[in-house]
């Protein structure tokens, strides 16, 4: 076993799971299902009408996955056709072999690990929760197989007021089930790291900052380090961030902040400007509160 120093390529080495620092991490949604994968969830996230055939006029994706490396038992035929008349196939996140393949790609191309998205607004459904659990177990096994790391990320999008606590209850169950006990679960500052995405955004979310603060307290009480997915302008409390004096008090509870920057810049020059005008002052403020 070889520990990878912070910032070094992870190809063909076992990534250390002791800290987030210096790692290349990706979000992993694991939300694609197919009608014949055994989960009875239809073509989730492939098709607009998930229980109708996935074919022309019923697609929810903009791009088609490159299926060249997938084995036959990972291919789920659709109603789309290749030019030669063969049915075009896609993959399912419920297939253990496919998740293992994704993790091998991560190993081969220097990605250290993933934050597995766990959408909190679907945890009330036994069927949807079961699918998420299957993906989680496959991710855990694939990380062990390939020397990658993983951590759970709760996405609060879609929750109504009073529902945020469901994420804390779910996490307690996962802790009881031992999800953080394996060698591949990512830790930070000596604690298992759990992420919560969707804190402080100005897009009319129904749940409250107080609920988010309570959730952080619950996760901390379980002995975890907490990462928050926050708006780009959380520090200034403008544009994509709520203007609320309690926002910074909630964010101070966290160990790591991860600003959402999708669409905030469109070129390397704009990225450099964003880093200088936004990230540098963000970092300066954050360092005060370490």
Where do the PLM segments sit?
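Conserved small/polar residues in nucleotide/adenosyl-binding loops
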Residues: 288-290
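N-terminal carbohydrate-binding/catalytic regions of secreted carbohydrate-active enzymes
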Residues: 23, 27-129, 133, 138
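The substrate-binding groove and active-site-proximal loops of carbohydrate-active enzymes
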Residues: 81-95, 115-130, 152-165, 192-206, ...
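Active-site region of glycoside hydrolase catalytic domains
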Residues: 36, 144-262
């Amino acid at each position: 076993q070889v520990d990878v120093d912070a910032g070094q390529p992870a190809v063909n080495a076992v990534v250390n799971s002791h800290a987030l620092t210096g790692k290349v991490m990706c979000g992993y949604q694991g939300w694609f299902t197919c009608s014949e994968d055994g989960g009875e969830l239809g073509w989730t996230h492939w098709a607009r009408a998930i229980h109708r055939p996935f074919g022309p006029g019923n697609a929810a994706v903009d791009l088609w996955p490159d299926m060249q490396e997938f084995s036959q038992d990972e291919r789920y035929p659709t109603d789309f056709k290749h030019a030669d008349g063969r049915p075009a196939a896609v993959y399912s996140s419920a297939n253990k072999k496919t998740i293992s393949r994704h993790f091998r790609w991560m190993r081969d191309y220097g990605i250290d690990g993933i934050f597995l998205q766990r959408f909190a607004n679907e945890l009330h459904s036994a069927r949807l929760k079961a699918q998420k659990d299957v993906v989680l177990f496959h991710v855990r096994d694939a990380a062990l197989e390939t020397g990658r790391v993983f951590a759970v990320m709760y996405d609060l999008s879609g929750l109504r007021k009073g529902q945020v606590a469901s994420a804390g209850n779910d996490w307690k169950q996962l802790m009881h089930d031992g999800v953080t006990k394996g060698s591949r679960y990512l830790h930070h500052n000596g604690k298992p790291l759990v992420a919560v995405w969707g804190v402080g955004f100005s897009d009319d979310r129904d749940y409250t900052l107080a609920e988010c603060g309570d959730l952080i307290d619950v996760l901390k009480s379980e002995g975890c380090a907490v990462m928050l997915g926050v708006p780009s302008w959380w520090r200034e409390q403008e544009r994509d961030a709520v203007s609320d004096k309690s926002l910074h008090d909630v964010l101070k509870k966290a160990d790591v902040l991860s600003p959402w920057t999708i669409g905030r810049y469109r070129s390397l020059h704009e990225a450099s400007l964003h880093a200088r005008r936004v990230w540098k002052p963000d970092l300066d403020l954050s360092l005060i509160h370490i």
